[in-house]
Amino acid sequence: MVLLQKAKHAKRIYAELIYTKTNCDGYKEQGITFPACEIQKQLLTDFYNECNISPDKLAFLEAHGTGTAIGDPEELNAIDKVLCQNRTTPLKIGTIKSNIGHSEPASGVCSIAKVIISLLLFPPSKFLYTVKYIIIDYLETRDILNIARNRRREKELFFTHSR
């Protein structure tokens, strides 16, 4: 369960929800579940422009990361184009789906819970110790950072959940 309330009324604060935004790209031949890099790029660009946060301040991103041959490269491409072009430090990326699978309508809440718990414990991924072959070509020119063993606390977090 996630309880959202005003900070002044909270007994304990685990995380703050600064801004939210969503979009939909279901008007295409392949259907709503087929990912589209351009639509994801637009969502990320609009999000950071509207909430007035520089993507360079982002330390960690909890991605949708379904582990599919089509979805992961599309999502990584959008993340790279919007969040990584001017970075001087690596952007750490994670996904809960490598531990629990895709929980369909609850996947966004699972991602939020994972990151909040990670701020305290940072549990390693159960299955993903190497980058899957479907994204190796895309990441060939990138530094790959395995965050499974990184236990540092991060302050700037972002969740992406697109369908």
Residue ranges and their predicted role:
Residues 1-163:
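Condensing-enzyme catalytic core of the thiolase-fold
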